[in-house]
């Protein structure tokens, strides 16, 4: 049965035209987002950001739904809103591509988060356009997360990852966690001097799928062999048992400074990550197919079980007939 799923996945991949990630489009999204200005959770600016994201998704033929909640932070209570857009596939099991669209709250300087908060949202918008035109064996979900950033100056305790924690808890409650098979998290990928290291918190096979794709694309100069430990929006998914990988460039000199502007990022970096993610996707789908039973199918017990069960039933009948 599993082999049949793998064959079906490969067949869909074979008839799908090559999907092209357009960094020019992604860059225009990034330019528009940065032009809004600082976009911290709960601000009027993040409302404008949500409208832009929803409008662009609609232009690509995708509808966005909102996950809204009140988050109690160490600083204040904030209304937060994550956006979800679904691209139906041949099966209901889904791969989630996620990234945050909020920027860190700073009052000392103007922080527009070109890479940190901007690049992930811009990337997901372009990825959505590409995957909408693709025949997807599994359902694809685009998740624009609010509340990744800490409200206090430092990342500490639960003052962070508000959106991802809320999403996972909601998925547990409504049962949709069962169909969530993998998370690919995109964060801070705009750096002109792009250096992405392996994350030791991420799921090894999923990490390998990304790094192997980078090597096949001759882009392994950007996806480095060394590793580091990263705390990010993938942690709640990992804690819930969802295979997850974080694609992030932490070696970014402009991180959490006023210099995180368009001057510090490049369309080339967006293109590199887009090419690698799209090259890795078929391999991720095939790997997941190997672990899944057919939709609606019952798992078959081994023949030996039926033979043993038949013997047991026969013995029970004989005992009953003998008056035992």
Describe the predicted segments one by one.
Residues 60-62, 91-95, 136-141, 178-182, ...:
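Loop/turn elements at helix/coil->beta-strand transitions in domains of secreted/extracellular proteins
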Residues 30, 34-41, 57-64, 87, ...:
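Sec/Tat-exported extracytoplasmic proteins
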Residues 16-20, 34-47, 71-74, 107-118, ...:
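Second-shell loop/turn segments in exported
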Residues 108-209, 226-229, 234:
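Acidic/histidine-rich catalytic neighborhood of metal-dependent amide-processing enzymes
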Residues 33, 67-69, 87-89, 98-102, ...:
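Active-site-proximal beta-strand/loop segments in catalytic clefts of secreted hydrolases
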């Amino acid at each position: 049965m599993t082999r049949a799923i793998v064959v079906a996945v490969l067949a869909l991949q074979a008839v799908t035209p090559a999907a092209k990630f357009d960094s020019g489009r992604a860059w225009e999204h990034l330019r528009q987002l940065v032009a809004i200005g600082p976009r911290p959770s709960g601000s009027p600016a993040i409302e404008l950001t949500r409208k832009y994201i929803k409008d662009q998704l609609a232009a690509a033929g995708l509808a966005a739904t909102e996950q809204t909640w009140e988050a109690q932070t160490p600083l204040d209570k904030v209304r937060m809103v994550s956006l979800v857009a679904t691209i139906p596939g041949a099966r209901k099991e889904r791969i989630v591509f996620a990234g945050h669209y909020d920027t860190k709250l700073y009052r000392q300087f103007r922080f527009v988060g070109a890479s940190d908060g901007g690049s992930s949202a811009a990337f997901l918008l372009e990825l959505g356009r590409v995957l909408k035109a693709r025949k997807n064996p599994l359902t694809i979900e685009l998740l624009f997360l609010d509340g990744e950033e800490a409200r206090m100056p430092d990342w500490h305790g639960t003052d962070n990852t508000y959106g991802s924690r809320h999403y996972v808890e909601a998925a547990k409650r409504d049962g949709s966690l069962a169909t969530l098979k993998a998370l690919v998290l995109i964060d801070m990928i705009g750096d002109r001097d792009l250096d992405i290291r392996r994350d030791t918190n991420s799921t090894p096979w999923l990490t390998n799928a990304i790094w192997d794709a980078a090597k096949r694309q001759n882009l392994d100069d950007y996806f480095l062999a060394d590793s580091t430990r990263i705390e990010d929006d993938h942690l709640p998914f990992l804690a819930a048992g969802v295979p997850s990988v974080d694609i992030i460039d932490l070696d970014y000199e402009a991180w959490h400074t006023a210099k995180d502007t368009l001057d510090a990022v490049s369309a080339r970096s967006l293109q590199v990550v887009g090419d690698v993610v799209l090259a890795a996707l078929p391999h991720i789908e095939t790997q997941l197919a190997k672990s899944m039973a057919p939709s609606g199918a019952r798992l078959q017990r081994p023949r030996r079980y039926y033979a043993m069960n038949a013997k047991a039933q026969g013995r029970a009948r004989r005992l009953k007939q003998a008056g035992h």
